[in-house]
A protein has these predicted regions:
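Phosphorylation-prone, low-complexity intrinsically disordered regions
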Residues: 2-5
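ATP-binding/phosphotransfer module of carbohydrate and carboxylate kinases, centering on a glycine-rich
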Residues: 11-154
Length: 154
């Protein structure tokens, strides 16, 4: 069971469209940093301090935010969400910058027929993926009211 596999969502590319995971993933930043001479484990060795990565990080933030904004539109076309939460194994400052880019890009897309939604930064960090998957499985198997997790507005 997936907590919501968004990696395969289509996003625009030079060749037409490709999967989101090929345009908004930490491995892309890692590859870019290695090409610039950084150690391949630099992100995992310094999970809370990504200063000094310069243009490689800035470009990754821009590309990732843009593609997550597009993915948010795709997802909102299928399900009415109150919010899209962007979280993961990255410093809070970087997460906030990605959210700002995603919000800006989303605002510029054609949203006709889409219920209004917010794009917000999560607060869980590196454990977000595991906790999201675990929560859905626990709710599906043990909750009396399976909708309780999704009733509160964000």
């Amino acid at each position: 069971m997936h907590a919501g596999a968004i990696g395969p969502l289509p996003v625009p590319s030079k060749s037409g469209s490709e999967q989101l995971i090929r345009h908004a993933s930490l491995y892309l930043l890692e590859r870019s940093l290695v090409r610039k001479g950084f150690d391949e484990l630099i992100l995992s060795r310094n999970p809370n301090d990504w200063t000094g990565f310069g243009p490689a990080l800035e470009q990754w933030i821009e590309d990732t935010g843009k593609n997550l904004g597009h993915a948010a539109l795709c997802a909102a076309g299928l399900i009415d969400f109150d919010a899209i939460v962007i979280d993961g194994a990255l410093p809070a400052k970087i997460r906030e910058q990605i959210v700002a880019v995603a919000q800006r890009h989303f605002a510029g897309l054609d949203q006709r027929g889409i219920a209004p939604l917010k794009i917000v930064a999560g607060t869980i960090g590196a454990d977000a993926r595991a906790m999201g998957g675990a929560a859905l499985s626990l709710m599906a198997n043990f909750a009396i009211d399976r909708d309780v997790l999704f009733k509160e507005a964000i």
